[in-house]
Amino acid sequence: MSEEKETIKERSSGFISVRDIPGVGSSIADKLEAAGYLSAWSIVVARAEELAERTGLPVLTVQKIIENARKMLGITFKTAREVKQERSNIGKITTGSKSLDELLGGGVETKTITEFFGEYGSGKTQICHQLSVNVQLTPEKGGLNGRAVYIDTEGTFRWERIEAMARALGLDPDKVMDNIYYMRAYNSDHQIAIVDELFTFVPKNDVRLVILDSVTSHFRAEYPGREHLAERQQKLNSHLHQLMRLAEAYNVAVVVTNQVMARPDVFYGDPTTAVGGHVLAHTPGVRIQLRKSKGNKRIARVVDAPHLPEGEVVFVITEEGIRDSEEE
């Protein structure tokens, strides 16, 4: 590997300030940071129009800054082997179930959006609670030594579950809860604003996991009927891409939950489908469907993931958290 490529790798794996971007002086850096753009990677994944609007800088200036940031970080054509090497920087969070981890290719990945969708009681929120605890574990135990952000749109977050899951892992419940930043989102605009704020909050607080439970509930309630469908989908699409940029810019795992709705045109097989249509179907890197089974058993199935084979596993929800089923 050349000296230039070694430098690129070092830069891409760590935090590089916007002040390190060539051509960015202190006054411009102040404006970028005030708007929530702290790292060079946050500039790379930003849209020029949005960056100009939020900073008050001219579009031409912003375009040059983005171009310089991309050159500095080596954002150019890469060989497949180089892409493979870069994936070694991706972290994975255990779900608490070995079989579910294997289905996910080793756990919930950073730098991507993982969606869990299913009917009420299928285990979506339970998995979110477990991940917010497990991300705090050491890498040897399946964590990332990081903190979690939990955005709750339906009021389903329960600190009692966090305590129980922490104790089951031999962790101090109070310390675990101190490392989970909770925010209740009251409508879709509030939800979008919270995610925008995370571009400043995440790098300052060692956050490695962002949970949004659920991503579609407010959009679905506020934009009912076909007459509002186009507006809803456009707004949801922009929101999902903001989450994707967040995951890629700061190497964090983004987990969203989603509801299901009935499909009246389906007479055989599963008559439900995830809410959000094609917009949500094409954005998350990994889509997992959850279904109820007997008792505390749940079934997880890979619906879409470019790097994972199709398959399904059984796991259980216990008082201690997400665990393997005896059947597996």
Swiss-Prot record:
Pfam family of the protein (one): Rad51
Binding sites annotated in the UniProt record for ATP: G118, E119, Y120, G121, S122, G123, K124, T125
GO molecular function per UniProt: ATP binding; ATP hydrolysis activity; ATP-dependent DNA damage sensor activity; damaged DNA binding
Gene3D superfamilies the record matches: 5' to 3' exonuclease, C-terminal subdomain, P-loop containing nucleotide triphosphate hydrolases
The entry's keywords: ATP-binding, DNA damage, DNA recombination, DNA-binding, Nucleotide-binding
UniProt keyword annotation of Ligase present: no
Family to which the UniProt record says this protein belongs: Belongs to the eukaryotic RecA-like protein family.
Function per UniProt: Involved in DNA repair and in homologous recombination. Binds and assemble on single-stranded DNA to form a nucleoprotein filament. Hydrolyzes ATP in a ssDNA-dependent manner and promotes DNA strand exchange between homologous DNA molecules.
Name of the protein this chain belongs to: DNA repair and recombination protein RadA
Lineage: Archaea, Thermoproteota, Thermoprotei, Desulfurococcales, Desulfurococcaceae
Gene: radA
